[in-house]
Amino acid sequence: MGLIVYYSSATGNTEYFVSQLGQRLFKIDKKKPSVLVDEPYVLVVPTYADGEGRMAVPKVVIRFLNECENRKLIRGVIGGGNRNFGCYYNLASKIIAEKCFVPCLYRFELRGTNEDVICVKKGLERFWKQLV
């Protein structure tokens, strides 16, 4: 199974979600965002946007993806967000998918549900098998 790279803020919603997936995890550290990964991965990222959709992708994630090696190895993105933000719900995953030319594999709200976890586990299993 592939690697999950994720960023989680102080709320811990994304970290909680990925911890339930039973996958190998690599957390993007705010203090060391330029660390390089050396294998294909799926990125799990929350959205942080102002009232107009600006700054949706966390800066630390932008710095991580600006590293050529990291950007080259991304295979898909999963987004976390809050539906209260309407059209900006999961905007970060949409932006990353578009800019990195990878599929947005799934979107979940807040910490996700048990159903979300099951869907993502099954989806990742199929996804990684397709890539091999």
Swiss-Prot record:
InterPro entries: Flavoprotein-like_sf (IPR029039), RNR_Ib_NrdI_bac (IPR020852), RNR_NrdI (IPR004465). It comes from the Bacteria. Pfam families: Flavodoxin_NdrI (PF07972). GO terms for molecular function: FMN binding. GO terms for biological process: protein modification process. Belongs to the NrdI family. Probably involved in ribonucleotide reductase function. This is Protein NrdI. It comes from Bartonella quintana (strain Toulouse) (Rochalimaea quintana).
